[in-house]
Amino acid sequence: MRPLFAAGQYPHGGMIRPLIRANRFPALRKCQNICGLIASPPFASTGISVDFKRTQGESTCDRPRGGENAYTAPIMDKLDFTFIHAPATYDFRERSIMYGPVSDMVPSTPIFEMYPLGLTTLCEYFERNGFRARIYNLASMMLHKKNFDVEKNLARLESRMFGIDLHWMPHCHGSIEVAKILKRLHPHVPISFGGLSSSIFHEDLIAYDCIDYVFRGDSTEEPMRMLVERVVRAQKTGTPVGDLSDIPNLTWKDKTGRVHINPLSWVPDDMNAISMDYDYPMKGVLRQLDFTSYLPMKGWLQYPVTASLTCRGCARNCATCGGSAYAFKNHFGRRKVAWRDPKLLIRDIEHVQNHVWGPIFVLNDFLQAGPAYTEQFICGLKGKVQNPIGFEFFGPPPGGNDFYNMLDANLKSWSVEISAESHDDDVRSAFGKGHYKMAELEDTIVEALSHPNCDRFDLYFMTGIPKQTAASVRETGAYVQHLYERVNYDPRLVVMTSPMAPFLDVGSIAFDNPEHYGYKLRARTFEEHRQRMILPSWKHIMNYESDYMSVDEMVDATYDAALDINRIKGEHGILDPAMSAAVDKRVREAREQMNRLDDVLYNGTGRIDTRMAALKEEFERLSENTVAEKSELNLAFNIKPTHALHLAKLGVSNVPANLANRLTGTWRSAASEFAYPPQKNGVQAPAWNPDGTPNCTFKGVVTDGMGDGRLLANDAGEQVAAFGSVVAPGFARENTNAAFDAENAELEAGRAGTDAVVGDACAIPAAQRGSVMRDPLLEQMMAEEAERTEHHGPLSAGGLKGAAGRAGARDARKLNKLRRREQ
């Protein structure tokens, strides 16, 4: 399981799932987001041309860092930084791809238009430091506007820098294609990448001509501010950016094209310097008068889900998770979890629910922080939560009934989510979840549902994990039947399953050591992953094959398990009969379509894309809600008068001032109304030894999780939680995952003295990198891509009006004009 908004990289099994069903109040829903009421033509813009004019002698760092932050300055010509969120596959509107169930367990569509929460924290951090920043959700724009011309709209953006997130690996195709277009349209504007996947593939990315900078690590607010300050100063003064070797976590090119990899040394100890109160996106929409480009995902207005993050990092070590303790230690330089102060977490929740009435999900199991943190957080919520609230846990909460009694005593309603991955304890142990047994999980489900304030308990399974066979997957239905019998078919228990797709997480233990965990990789480098994103279906796109079941067996077993679970829920009233019948029909149609696809691919002649074109409409219909209805996971919520009042107050306090600023030529910051301190580096052992070699020997000390974060160590001060499964201090639970931890410790030790690449926290030995499986279908499609590009140019993503030839000619003319100016 991976938290979609937070540490884990891939959105196929994360905490933020579509748990909400918006009540149908058309009149009230009109004011669901006051921003939407004013974000309509002719006021909506794709990128307003504004700039700060510095007062003589003023430093960017001297600008307000907190409070009202209503700093205004004369408008000049452009934004300082624009974050662009690309679709997973850039030209998805032209291609025929059967995405299948890859996004069934998350709120977004298969193009993963939901941008990471980190974009909002970065923008807010920039704004409180005096820079102008905005989010431009290109994927959302492409989904919402059928005729949206990508290149035309990107050409209108005016910014001193562009940033593209590559946090979740499925964006590997779209992010690069958008970067190429931006560099064509704005050849002198630097482009930076960031996110967990960017951190892992920073050397691959910096090799692209269209990328100038790559940031590594999970907390780059301050390093990025340092770079933005240099770039803005250089552009305003007409001087070179200069040497950037003092900016931590940065991979960059100098003016000669030489690549530099700065130390991965910026790793804050806590999450207290960033804003998680949603002030920035709400104020940003009102300021830009542009709602669609800020929209988190398709359907958000009817489904306004929000998240509160407890931490960055993890004390657990699931084998296939790119957000595990192993991944954070070896790829992101983090030796301990960075916790958010529970008081700030409570304030975040209070502030969000003032303006958004959808459910709030608390991500990243806060029980890892220990009992003191847990008690302060839960008790602090008493009387303050009016929205539905859900908690993600990585296992049965210690204390059982006592813990649920505490939830009942402080919250009027609450929900729980746990991803067990498999009903088979042996499979779960191989995955890294041997610290509890399914019998314990069953007990905690019964205990939770016995409490009157428990709204629901969501349980998730996943196919494709280590040592899992097709037979084991098909046994899931029988286990679910047993589980429902035990809770007397309580409809508050919601069970779902989905595949580990499209990718095995890069940076995970299993990705770095595939043979050890029973995998063969179809892709290892960034470019190999990028190429796979245009393949015809989710089973072809996958970057791995398991030794325990073939890809075809996995697809069939996934559909079988989904059919069984759906049938059980339909027969016993857990799911509406009509909805159950619709899901059953769609799963069977999806399976039939996959068989038809195989027939077209392997028995047809001619170009693959031509053969696939006839299937596009059916692919699109069957690539959402494939194995389940998203609405099945929806929690009912109510709109309260206080929501409308707070929205009205937000509009009154911002809209007139923003309009006045536009008329007078000034800029109004969208920074949070709360004061936050500057981000500071952590005091943990550095990621680098004095001689420049990676430091992989750090041992922590025990702490209770308050203030300075939960160190990954046991009572003896030995670093064991970096290999996963120790329980937070204060909770007496046996570590039943010792064998799994020992195996990973052995793998970790085997990395010492290997051919470490400068800049990697701990490099993968060359012997482990190996070669990937040969894929004839991919080879044929890439040959066809090359032939088509040579004769006709690349596919256009400009919508119905975006002919590639015309756009390419226009771009060439613009580029030639810019070059003539330089000469």
Q: Regions from the language model: what does each represent?
A:
Residues 5, 9, 70-83, 132, ...:
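Radical SAM enzyme core and accessory elements
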Residues 76-81, 92-97, 247, 253-310:
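N-terminal [4Fe-4S]-dependent radical SAM core
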Residues 79-84, 163, 192, 341-456, ...:
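Conserved SAM/AdoMet-binding glycine-rich loop
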Residues 81-111:
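Short glycine-rich His-centered loop
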Residues 91-93, 201-202, 316, 328-329, ...:
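Flexible glycine/acidic-rich beta-alpha junction loops that bind and position SAM and/or redox cofactors
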Residues 118, 125, 134-270, 506:
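Glycine-rich beta-alpha loop elements in corrinoid/cobalamin-binding modules
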Residues 204-207, 467-482:
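Catalytic cores of alpha/beta
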Residues 298-341:
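Canonical Radical SAM [4Fe-4S] cluster-binding loop centered on the CxxxCxxC motif
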